[in-house]
A protein has these predicted regions:
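Conserved active-site alpha-helix within GNAT-family acetyltransferase domains
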Residues: 96, 121-139
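Terminal substrate-recognition subdomain of acyl/acetyltransferases
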Residues: 147-165
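Conserved beta-strand-loop-alpha-helix junction that forms the acyl-donor binding cleft
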Residues: 87, 116-127, 143-147
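Acetyl-CoA-dependent GNAT
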Residues: 7-81, 86-88, 99-109, 140-143, ...
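Conserved G/P- and acidic residue-centered "switch" motifs that form tight phosphate/ATP-binding loops
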Residues: 93
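Conserved GNAT acetyl-CoA-binding A-motif
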Residues: 106-118
Length: 165
């Protein structure tokens, strides 16, 4: 499977919207700032994070199959967020590919020496994936619903070679 990251195109947002079936899924994916149902035409603006960059993962034919963002919260560390894989692509290694490419791009673009993310405790598939990529829980920064996870760049996967926004 040939998967690549690219900057968002307007048609990508239509695919992304179809991956979010209800208000609960929307809240868990995007947080409280994006209310369901959301107008697809407003998604590019709704997803803006100051200093952040959005990416779509696409199959060789250009069909979007994943989405993720990165932004800097603390100097020296880059945070990954709003990671989602198309329901049709789940269980096929697409989440791993998305995370590996997103990590590489985030580190390359920011020069960070650590990567962080948050994941719902009950999302066993995602917790397992992130753990397999070297992320470790930071309980001091976690809460009853979500685990804050961190990995150093030297212990993470190899960086992707593509261009920053």
């Amino acid at each position: 499977m040939n998967l690549t990251l690219h900057q968002p195109r307007p048609s990508d947002y239509e695919a992304l919207a179809s991956w979010v079936p209800d208000a609960v899924a929307c809240l868990r994916w995007a947080g409280p700032r994006i209310l369901f149902p959301f107008p697809v035409s407003e998604l590019p603006d709704l997803l803006v994070v100051p200093g952040g960059t959005s990416y779509f993962l696409a199959e060789g034919c250009g069909v979007p199959c994943g989405f993720g963002q990165h932004w800097v919260i603390v100097a020296g560390s880059v945070h990954l967020g709003r990671i989602i894989v198309s329901p049709a692509a789940r269980g096929k290694g697409v989440g791993r590919a998305l995370c590996e490419l997103l990590i590489g791009e985030a580190v390359r673009c920011t020069g960070a020496n650590a990567i962080t993310l948050r994941v719902y405790r009950d999302n066993a598939v995602a917790v397992s994936l992130y753990s397999s990529l070297g992320f470790l829980p930071v309980e001091a920064d976690s809460d009853k619903e979500a685990i804050f996870m961190r990995v150093g760049v030297n212990t993470s996967i190899e960086r992707a070679d593509s261009s920053c926004a």
